[in-house]
């Protein structure tokens, strides 16, 4: 029995919720193969068995180790879907069928079929040390090369001069951007480029106004020191108050300027599974409610 799984609360590139079963002679252009992709970004488990009768079985779904759900009488629970496809002409055809299905039936809205922009991101060039002048210099060089979009990365908000503080305080840092976000966006657009911006909404720094005001919003087990990753904790996204706060702050930023693109980052996995919103016998619902 082969297994691919994640109990980190996320899927990601580390453990991807997909699998391919293929014949030994399968190549990119020849051979038979089955593919399955779990449409879910939380903890998952894929098990594949090949038994003594030469029968293959695949099971793919929510990871059972962290999952519990109290189902009331007459209530329902909708499990996430799995995309399943087959190719008798190799892995390339299998990939194309997945891509076509996702593009035509999973992607939605006006962005479904538009051409994706070529973009430049300031992160590796500046890290947290930037101002409007530095960002515009990058944009000017990128525009000269024909780049379509500039994405402003981490550090534009709160007191965010390193990765130890400021996460959760989604207010423009006007010491770095003197004219505010709107002025910078206008200048970038004047170069013929679009503008994108970075968020990491799930996260909170202990050194932030948000955490000082609402420490109870962070996922942590009472009476224990929390596990930190990249010097940050996670917000309890199953909490409606947290959802409302993030929706309001992110909406205000996106409505404050002509922003075309969001880079939604997530730089750590989830641990310390506990929420004050559920009793002890229902804590296993948090991983799915979080997603």
Each model region followed by its residue ranges:
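Aromatic- and glycine-enriched glycan-recognition loops and surfaces
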Residues: 126-212, 244-248, 289-291
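Glycine-rich, aromatic-flanked loop segments that form ligand/cofactor-binding clefts
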Residues: 18, 22-44, 86-110, 118, ...
């Amino acid at each position: 029995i082969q297994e691919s799984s994640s109990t980190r609360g996320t899927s990601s590139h580390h453990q991807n919720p997909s699998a391919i079963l293929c014949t030994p002679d399968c190549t990119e252009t020849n051979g038979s193969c089955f593919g399955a992709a779990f449409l879910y970004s939380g903890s998952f488990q894929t098990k594949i068995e090949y038994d003594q009768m030469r029968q293959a079985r695949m099971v793919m779904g929510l990871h059972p180790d962290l999952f519990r759900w109290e189902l009331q009488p007459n209530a329902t629970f909708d499990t996430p879907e799995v995309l399943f496809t087959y190719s008798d002409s190799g892995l390339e055809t299998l990939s194309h069928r997945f891509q076509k299905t996702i593009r035509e039936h999973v992607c939605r809205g006006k962005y479904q079929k538009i051409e994706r922009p070529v973009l430049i991101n300031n992160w590796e060039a500046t890290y947290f040390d930037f101002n409007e002048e530095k960002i515009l210099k990058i944009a000017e060089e990128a525009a000269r090369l024909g780049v379509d979009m500039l994405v402003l990365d981490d550090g534009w908000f709160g007191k965010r001069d390193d990765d130890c503080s400021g996460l959760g305080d989604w207010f423009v840092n006007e010491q770095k951007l003197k004219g505010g976000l709107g002025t910078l966006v206008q200048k970038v657009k004047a170069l013929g480029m679009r503008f994108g911006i970075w968020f990491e909404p799930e996260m909170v720094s202990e050194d932030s106004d948000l955490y000082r005001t609402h420490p109870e919003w962070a996922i942590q087990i009472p009476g224990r020191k929390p596990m930190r990753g990249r010097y940050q904790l996670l917000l309890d996204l199953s909490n409606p108050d947290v959802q409302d706060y993030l929706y309001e702050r992110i909406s205000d930023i996106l409505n404050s300027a002509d922003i075309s693109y969001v880079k939604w980052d997530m730089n750590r996995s989830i641990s310390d599974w506990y929420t004050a919103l559920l009793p002890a016998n229902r804590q296993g619902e948090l991983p799915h409610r979080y997603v």
